[in-house]
């Protein structure tokens, strides 16, 4: 680039950043993607051409959507989905819920029993809620593109056997994550430590 600059007139563009199309293709997890739909004609054409350089992308359909009466964003309720994806509180099917908070130093995730507060077989209920929470946490890490240090406060994590089982389960869930994700350990206070490689901005950013 330096050598090029030496022999180029002033105000000449020496380089340009990655195109939107290239950025999109780079971030697609092709093995898990069946179809890409866009309502932007130019982007559609660029995607069709660019994906030819990616062998694994050939199995993914690229569709151009055109309907002036029903925009693509409204068809898939994108605004509502995006709003939900940015909420701190996420309800679980069991009645429990997660609280996800991002700070500059780490991501804190708190698991709560919520509406699921039956005292009968409490220990077993806690284990079920924790497993359900682990599954949702693995999904949220990818959905929100959370990275760095992630600290998870599961319910009643005092029993070492329960800790070990949950560690293994969480490890199996993040194994399919395209970003390097490591379930480190459970601290003396019962907090699970997870690290996830940073690749781009979070959904909130």
Task: Walk through the language-model features, giving the residues of each.
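OB-fold/S1-family RNA-binding modules
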Residues: 1-98, 103, 179-205
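Conserved glycine-centered short motifs in functionally critical loops
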Residues: 94-205
């Amino acid at each position: 680039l330096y050598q090029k600059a030496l022999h180029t007139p002033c105000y000449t563009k020496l380089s340009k950043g990655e195109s939107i199309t290239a950025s999109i293709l780079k971030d697609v997890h092709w093995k898990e993607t069946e179809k890409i739909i866009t309502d932007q004609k130019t982007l559609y054409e660029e995607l069709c051409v660019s994906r030819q350089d990616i062998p694994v992308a050939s199995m993914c359909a690229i569709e151009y959507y055109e309907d002036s009466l029903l925009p693509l964003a409204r068809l898939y309720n994108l605004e509502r989905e995006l709003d939900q994806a940015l909420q701190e509180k996420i309800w679980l099917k069991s009645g429990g819920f997660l609280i996800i908070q991002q700070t500059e130093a780490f991501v804190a995730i708190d698991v709560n029993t919520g509406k699921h507060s039956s005292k009968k077989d409490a220990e077993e209920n806690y284990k079920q809620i924790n497993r359900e929470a682990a599954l949702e946490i693995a999904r949220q890490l990818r959905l929100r593109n959370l990275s760095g240090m992630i600290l998870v406060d599961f319910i009643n994590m005092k029993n070492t056997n329960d800790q070990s089982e949950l560690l293994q389960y969480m490890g199996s869930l993040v194994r399919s994550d395209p970003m390097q994700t490591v379930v480190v350990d459970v601290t003396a206070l019962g907090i699970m430590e997870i690290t996830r490689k940073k690749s781009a901005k979070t959904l909130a950013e």
